[in-house]
């Protein structure tokens, strides 16, 4: 049986009445994110790992209109590069695989159960403010804000506290999404406890141990980014002296 025939005949992988099935969760998440303005104009994406399968939203599709039959499925583990080596076991032939795929795989290699990519305006703005205030090597930092408690300290280390300082690394954007992979992995190595990486003038990647954690961490971070922008307008420091 050919690889293409296999990809066409695995529709059962995305057919389920269970609302918690990845093929149902990804469209629901994308509709939710569209309402926040995070995935407008087909931007952004989401991916979920279940056992040895990776479910991924397609590229170039209006995210609020995604349906379960639009979802790609990869065998895991699978090579990041070259793209032709990736082991798709379901591939809607009329759609393009997500350009975020190798970045999602980098998160799954760190034990994540879900990875989310958004084009949040607040995320973009804080990367510009950090660049202006700290230069290209600076990271986003904020402390003494209650919502910080929604972010983990690191794997198995519990959640951050009110007096902790949250640090989110920032990497430079590239012309093509997949070219961000090495910089993302370098940031993961430099900040081993982080659950997110900002991309300057682009957006953010957020991951979590499961779907609920990735979603709530993404929400908490976006809240903090918006608050940081408003604090900056008022001349208030992000990190309390």
Swiss-Prot record:
One of its GO terms (biological process) is L-methionine salvage from methylthioadenosine. Zn(2+) binds at residues 117, 119, 202. Its main location: cytoplasm. Pathway: Amino-acid biosynthesis; L-methionine biosynthesis via salvage pathway; L-methionine from S-methyl-5-thio-alpha-D-ribose 1-phosphate: step 2/6. GO terms for molecular function: methylthioribulose 1-phosphate dehydratase activity; zinc ion binding. Keywords: Amino-acid biosynthesis, Cytoplasm, Lyase, Metal-binding, Methionine biosynthesis, Zinc. Its cofactor is Zn(2+). Its EC number is 4.2.1.109. It is found in: Cytoplasm. Signal peptide: none annotated. The active site is at 146 (proton donor/acceptor). Residues 1-20 are annotated as: Disordered. Transmembrane segments: none annotated. This is Methylthioribulose-1-phosphate dehydratase. It comes from Blastomyces gilchristii (strain SLH14081).
